[in-house]
């Protein structure tokens, strides 16, 4: 285990040396970081690049030789989902952070480009009840998404609207001009996006998420982008399967709230 190393961002010329450490992972957010589209790669300082972290928004993928300093490093997030490459990383996270890291399971969805039925997806969009309207996210809707905690993740990965306009894609459903559900690109990589789905609590289980997600998937297919899906819970798996995806496997993550530096000094 590597100890007592200064952590720094990976230099562009080092990415090719780091990429093999992530070779066994089919995670679009890792691809975003490696391609330099979004996110960052972090490494312990030194000439031997044997450990790395791919961090994008709330996700941090830890790979290579376990390094305690990469677990305790402040990635600048109030909430972080740490994804260990293997059991050695998982053991290190538990050893270093203890009960400050909540053990959770997430659900990987297969990446199958030909799994979608465009007619079925179009029907799901058109099934939207009359009191609702669906809109592509523009500047006004981008700003409205940021006004509420439940909808902020639809666009918060993009520091400004211009960034979202350049890289992002998304749709929201409104009622009387107010956003009640949405589907957007949580992140972007060269060949596609990672999907984010959010619905205001009192509007859930009304088919709104299916309509918004269908509109997003159809637009991705029209643009030649792959709409990747990763599920937080089994309800998200069920929605994905309704839209044509297939479940792949469960995987372990650790949810860490608040600043890591503060956490580690708290009794």
Language-model segments: what does each one mean?
Residues 33-48, 56, 162-171, 193:
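A short helix-loop-beta-strand connector motif used in the catalytic cores of GNAT acetyltransferases and
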Residues 68-73, 195, 205-219, 238, ...:
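Conserved acetyl-CoA-binding loop-helix of GNAT-fold acetyltransferases
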Residues 160-192, 196-200:
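A conserved beta-strand-loop-helix scaffold within acyl/acetyltransferase catalytic domains
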């Amino acid at each position: 285990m590597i100890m007592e190393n200064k952590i720094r961002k990976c230099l562009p010329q080092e990415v090719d040396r780091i990429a093999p450490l992530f070779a066994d992972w089919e995670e679009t957010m890792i691809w975003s970081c490696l391609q330099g589209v979004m996110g960052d790669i972090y490494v312990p300082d030194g000439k031997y690049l044997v450990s790395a972290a791919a961090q994008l928004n709330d996700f941090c993928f830890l790979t290579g030789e376990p390094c305690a300093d990469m677990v305790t490093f402040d990635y600048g997030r109030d909430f972080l989902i740490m994804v260990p490459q293997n059991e050695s990383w998982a053991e290190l996270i538990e050893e270093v952070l203890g009960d400050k890291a909540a053990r959770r399971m997430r659900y990987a969805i297969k990446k199958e480009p030909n799994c979608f039925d465009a007619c079925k997806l179009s029907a799901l969009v058109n099934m939207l009840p009359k009191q609702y309207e669906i809109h592509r996210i523009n500047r006004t809707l981008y700003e409205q998404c940021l006004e509420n905690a439940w909808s902020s993740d639809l666009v918060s990965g993009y520091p400004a609207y211009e960034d979202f306009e350049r890289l992002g894609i998304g749709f929201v459903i409104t009622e009387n001009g107010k956003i009640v559900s949405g589907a957007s690109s949580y992140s972007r990589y060269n060949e596609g996006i990672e999907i984010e789905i959010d619905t205001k609590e009192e509007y859930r289980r009304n088919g709104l998420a299916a309509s918004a997600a269908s509109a997003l998937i159809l637009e991705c297919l029209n643009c030649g982008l792959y709409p990747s899906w990763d599920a937080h819970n089994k309800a998200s798996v069920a929605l994905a399967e309704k839209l044509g995806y297939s479940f792949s496997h469960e995987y372990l993550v650790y949810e860490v709230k608040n600043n890591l530096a503060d956490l580690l000094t708290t009794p």
